[in-house]
């Protein structure tokens, strides 16, 4: 159940344990931090990186959260966008002569916070 509160001006969307290196996700996040919602959508749709699609879905989720709380997503901007490292999955890769090497598969947590410009003034 969602209760509507008119004093709330920011909404958050969080994606955890994304199978992606935090460094590769930060490369995309640094391009959208502080930009408006519509400008962010245009940037992410044209980016060739794999992380852009995951972050685009997360921005859509944050906009849906804003809509559920009665905020206008067209007048919002990305006030906070961060990528934190998650757990590292350790796998074994078979090698020659019966040996094996450890493969590290990193994960990350991505947080997007949308803030409303009109209620922020």
Curated annotation (Swiss-Prot):
Signal peptide: none annotated. The lineage of its organism: Eukaryota, Viridiplantae, Streptophyta, Embryophyta, Tracheophyta. NCBIfam families: rplV_bact (TIGR01044). Keywords: Chloroplast, Plastid, Ribonucleoprotein, Ribosomal protein, RNA-binding, rRNA-binding. Disulfide bonds: none annotated. This is Large ribosomal subunit protein uL22c. GO terms for cellular component: chloroplast; large ribosomal subunit. It comes from the Eukaryota. It comes from Lemna minor. PANTHER family: CHLOROPLAST 50S RIBOSOMAL PROTEIN L22-RELATED (PTHR13501), LARGE RIBOSOMAL SUBUNIT PROTEIN UL22M (PTHR13501:SF10). It is found in: Plastid, Chloroplast. Part of the 50S ribosomal subunit. Belongs to the universal ribosomal protein uL22 family. InterPro entries: Ribosomal_uL22, Ribosomal_uL22_bac/chlpt-type, Ribosomal_uL22_bac/org-type, Ribosomal_uL22_CS, Ribosomal_uL22_sf. This protein binds specifically to 23S rRNA. The globular domain of the protein is located near the polypeptide exit tunnel on the outside of the subunit, while an extended beta-hairpin is found that lines the wall of the exit tunnel in the center of the 70S ribosome. GO terms for biological process: translation. The gene is rpl22. GO terms for molecular function: rRNA binding; structural constituent of ribosome.
